[in-house]
Design a protein with these regions (language model features):
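Long hydrophobic alpha-helical segments that form multi-pass transmembrane helix bundles
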Residues: 10-21
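C-terminal substrate-binding/cap subdomain adjacent to the FAD-binding core in PCMH-type
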Residues: 24
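Active-site pocket scaffolds in enzymes
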Residues: 29-156
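Short, small-residue-biased leader/transition segments that mark boundaries at the very start
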Residues: 1-8
Length: 156
């Protein structure tokens, strides 16, 4: 699988207890830099604190699309099958999780077990702990306000 399209230049880092710090961390030159396509697993075992704290990818990136769901916020491509998935969203972030907690105990279709890192998830979202982080987009919903969010996963 390759690439994350317009994933932005920064992500929301964790401290050593897996809590979001409230900062934005530039990704340039780190294993979290997907601005240029490369395989997801290529850098996943790098000696980098943000990967070590969650044993792989389980991070939120700030999206460059800023609420514009008319262009892809991210994409992933499997060169073996030729499948491509594009993600369009109005959300400000995307969480990418690489199955770091899978241990081969959960089974799926035909009773096949899901081993460590045998999946990847793309979850559009606001940033974790945003009510307590003044730098993050607000998630406060006041009486009378309506929340709208739109996400499309398009397969080719």
């Amino acid at each position: 699988s390759r690439g994350l399209g317009d994933v932005y230049k920064r992500q929301t880092p964790y401290d050593d207890k897996k809590c979001v710090t409230g900062e934005y961390l530039p990704v340039a030159g780190t294993p979290l830099d997907f601005r240029m396509p490369h395989t997801i697993g290529e850098r996943i075992d790098a000696d980098y604190p943000q990967l070590k704290v969650v044993n792989g990818y389980d991070h939120t990136w700030e999206l460059n699309t800023k609420g514009d769901d008319t262009r892809p916020a991210a994409w992933v491509y499997d060169p073996t099958s030729g499948r491509k998935m594009e993600i369009f969203t109005t959300e400000p972030g995307i969480q990418i999780y690489t199955g770091n907690g899978l241990k081969g105990k959960m089974t799926g279709k035909r009773g096949i077990a899901y081993p460590f890192r045998s999946a990847v998830c793309f979850e559009t979202m606001h940033f974790q702990d945003s009510p307590n982080q003044p730098e993050f987009p607000s998630t406060v919903l006041r009486p009378g306000e309506v929340f709208h969010s739109h996400t499309v996963y398009k397969f080719e």
